Amino acid sequence: MGMLASNAQFVEWILKVKSNIDSGQFKPMQMAAIAALNNSEEWHNEMNINLYKNRRHLAEEIMKSLGCSFDPTQVGMFLWGKIPAHYNDSAELADKVLYEARVFITPGFIFGNKGQRYVRLSLCANEKMLDEALERIKAM
């Protein structure tokens, strides 16, 4: 689900590209979006504040456990962290976490050369999964 707001010419170009890439959203996703849009503003605020805040806290704790530094003013559905200097690159840290803790963290190199020293955590996972990931990483 998404939304586009732009001038008419840009919208026309984007719709032309989109019409060749996909043919629409899966119907159950459309129905879920309708249901979500029908919830009250208070419900959305509560979900965003509490869910995001708790997930963000767990992601920050994971970064700290890995020795990664991060900008606490980041916003969005991901948390980026700079890896400690003793790792050669983000792949080395991601592999260590995967093999020793059985937790996948996204190595930044997959986003280009500037990501070599960074890892990315998603805040889309539920709190239980993030908490379990944190405990596994702490046990490494």
Regions found by a protein language model. Give the residues of each.
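PLP-dependent class I/II
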Residues: M1-M140
